[in-house]
Structures are given as C-alpha cells and as structure tokens.
Amino acid sequence: IILFNSDYNPQNEQEYLDVVRRYRVDGVLAVPIRETSAEWQEYVKKLDVPIVTVTRRAKGLDSVYVDHIQAGSMVASHLLEQGFRRFLFIGKDYDGKYVGFRQMLVQMGYGEQTANLVYQDDVQLKQALELWFRQASERGAVFAGNDIYALRVLDALRKLDVFIPKEVGVIGFDNTSTGRYLNPRLSSVSQPIAQMAQEAVTRLLDRIEHPGQWEVLDYPLSAELVLREST
C-alpha cells in the first residue's frame, strides 16, 4: 500500500498520480481535492489501472460519494427553519455544497441574501466577516465548507464580540470530533465514512481480481445533519 497526501495542493495531486503511473500499482482509491474536471477524469483514465473515486463523483469512473448538492440543500433548509435570513458560504462557488445550498436559498427567495467567501487567511476572514455582519441587521448564518473553516469562523466571530447563535449561526462539514468540545458546540454535516470506505474497497478489489468490462459504479450516499448549539 502506498499512501499519498496532497495536502489540498493540486500540483502535489498531479505529481502523485504520475508516481502511480511509474510504479504500475494494481489499483487506486482517489479522494479528489476538488470537484473533478473533465481533464482530471481523462488523465486518471490514462493511468490504465482500476480506480475508484471516494467522496466526490467523477463521470465515467467508479465513484462512491456523498451527494454534496443534496447536503448543501439540507443545510439551507435547516438554517431557514432556525430563523436565519442572510447566508455566507466559506469555500469556492463551484463546490457542490455551495451549489445545493444556494439553489435551495434561491428557490426560497433568499438568493440576494446569499454569498460565498474564499478563505485566504485569518486576517482576511475576520475582516470579511466583520463587513458582512455589519451590512445588515437580519440574523445571519455561515456555512463553512469544512470543520476547519468553521473553527476559524467561530474564532473570528468571538473576537468581533458576535453572539453565536443569537446573532450569527455557524455550521461546518465533516463532523470532526473537535466540534463536540467547542463552546458553543459546532453543528456539522456527517458523512458515512465507514460505509464509503467499505464500498470503495470492495469495488476496487473486484476490479483488480476480475478485470474486464464492468458497468461504471455510481454510488451516492446521504449525509446527515448533526445539530448542536452553534445553530
């Protein structure tokens, strides 16, 4: 087993895929760092080894993943039910989580009250959150693309003396263990990691042991809201 961690760096990801090609491995479990592009999909197909993508869907490749669009929509519905009326997503606008989040809010009439912010550093985040918070009096909510971003949001809001969730709600994604020990404890979205891993490994071994023509596996799983005090 060869394990690579790209550290969310696209260049590292590309280099590690090149290593996979050189070492002629038997199979690959890939966890793409971003939404898979057509170019990425074509490149990994040329590796000429069985490959299963995990956590994100890749067209034309076996994929075991959580439907991020559905998860984002679910988060939006929850925040609306809690009385929030302005919304900020921390992450890229092409992230499936934001796509589903925004689609639901547009459908409910809150498209103009919804925006996204790409994280650069803690100073930029604090300044952007302060500007967003001061712009309007309506109660707002921040949906962070992962729990790490959510922790940074909570820290920035505390430094701005913003009351959570009375003035601003915060929800993350991944449901990491850290969120349970914060004050307030962090609401988040949980992915069925064990099930994803089991299905992906089973599929990869089948591909390795029984090569040939297979129908492409498209295996979406549902995420689950884990609600705590931050929303």
Q: Can you say where each PLM-predicted feature lies in the sequence?
A:
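Beta-alpha junction/loop-to-helix N-cap segments that form part of ligand/metal-binding clefts
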Residues: 31-36
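Bacterial carbohydrate/catabolite-sensing allosteric modules
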Residues: 11, 15-24, 37-39, 45-231
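Intrinsically disordered, low-complexity polar regions and short flexible loop motifs
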Residues: 28
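Helix-turn-helix/homeodomain-like alpha-helical modules used for DNA recognition
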Residues: 1-15
